[in-house]
Amino acid sequence: MTRSPEAKALGIALGEPWFKLAPRAKEWGLVAKSSNYELYGDISARVMELLGRYSAWLEVYSIDEAFLGVRGNPEELLLLGQAMKTAVRRNVGVPVCVGIAGTKTLAKLANKWAKHNPAFDGVCHWDSVPADRQERLMAGLSVIELWGVSTRLTKRLNALGIHTVLDLARADPVRIRDRFSVVLMRTVLELRGTPCIPLEEERIGRDQLIFSRSFATPISTPAGMRQVLGIYAQQASARLARHGLQAKVLTAFAATSHYNPRDSSHPSVCVSLPMPTADPVLLARAAYALLPRIDDGVKYARAGIMVTDLRPTANQAPLAVFENPHEERGIGPLLEEVSRKYGRGSIGLGHAGIRGGPDWTMKRDMLSPRYTTHWDELPVVKAA
């Protein structure tokens, strides 16, 4: 979640609900739009693909942030940063800022200053900033604005007299490790220019993937829950296949709202699959093991699945005792191909393939067009 410079200038708070802004919408020229995650994801993928052309070392940190490994002197890297910024703006149409430094923590700070200081023109190389100005910039930044420092941690640091980024950079690393953690000690060292946080080129190599969301309208029937689980199984299959992974264990869960303690229910089930798989049918079948534990009439406000014990597809033994013929059917790739061609929700597993958004999905009545992924939402131009 973020705000544009224009929103900040109007004094709009981060996460401020629309109903508070609506009375002044016309005066301020505001237009309400629903979250368009499909468009965001596609634009993000385009940006990351473009950035990957500039370096063999790319870590996609989040939907709107990436780290790249680069080499060169400050002048060369500033030119590279400007080239990346210009290319993303020209080819994708979104503005980006570039922060360059010898450590990831300092690169984050350089990016922040590039974003907020017009003098940098969107690209800041830490080593090109004079030492006295570096200190002034760090002294003017609260420690809570530092990467990985939470509100709770900030309070503990403040109690020790550490209020700014400069204060933390000057702190004794060993004392920080003993009082807090080795993670924060690494941050101190990174602020001093010692690389401690490596570039993670394959962040998907994790232990688990979770697909879960709260419902706009509670689900109170096993049939409704079956649709939810089928959709999540299909999403999990696509994500696993995209990164060349298979799952050995699937956990499905549901929960009522904590605001309704009278009908509290939190069923869950853990299924160990015979073999690691990314097949959507097998994942859905495992998720459906939750259905006998769903109480008819109870209003469930949230559900999801978690796949764990993830393994690279290439590591599967060719002479396994238990063969898995389902992977050869190619159902997952087929679903993805149809979805790419006709749009998300155009095909699915059983009830998950029902056309049109179910009642429980997030309400997005003011959705902007998904120009890059839906043919039927492209603008039409008529020539007279």
Map each language-model feature to its residues:
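Short Gly/Ser/Thr- and Asp/Glu-enriched loop/turn motifs at secondary-structure junctions
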Residues: 61-65, 101-104, 245-249, 298-302
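DNA-contacting surface of Y-family translesion DNA polymerases
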Residues: 138, 145, 153-299, 382-383
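Acidic, metal-coordinating catalytic segment for phosphate/diphosphate chemistry
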Residues: 266, 273-384
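Short acidic, glycine/serine/threonine-rich loops at helix termini
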Residues: 1-4, 106-114, 181, 198-203, ...
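Residues that scaffold, gate, or flank divalent-cation-dependent active/transport sites
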Residues: 1-63, 67
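Long, highly charged, low-complexity intrinsically disordered interaction regions
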Residues: 80-144
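Catalytic palm subdomain of template-directed nucleic-acid polymerases
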Residues: 68-86, 161
